[in-house]
């Protein structure tokens, strides 16, 4: 995905692989449908912060998805 690769290069960070892209898109869907739509990009941002601090992406996504699926 040239767009995401270009952004990653400009930010000086590692790009996303297909598994990471799929996990983040699934996260955005689950958050948007399980809470409010506006929470999807914000939750993705928080996952990025957690990953930047050393948490595994799948673990961070799992934590956030758990909140999205239990929100009433």
What are the residue ranges of the model-derived segments?
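C-terminal binding/interaction regions
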Residues: 4-7, 16, 26, 55-72
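Amphipathic, hydrophobic secondary-structure cores in small proteins
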Residues: 16-52
């Amino acid at each position: 995905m040239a767009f995401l690769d270009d952004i990653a290069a400009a930010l000086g960070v590692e790009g996303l692989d297909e598994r990471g892209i799929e996990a983040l898109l699934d996260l955005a869907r689950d958050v948007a449908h399980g809470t409010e739509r506006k929470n999807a990009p914000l939750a993705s941002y928080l996952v990025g912060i957690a990953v930047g601090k050393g948490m595994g992406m799948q673990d961070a996504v799992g934590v956030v998805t758990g909140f999205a699926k239990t929100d009433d």
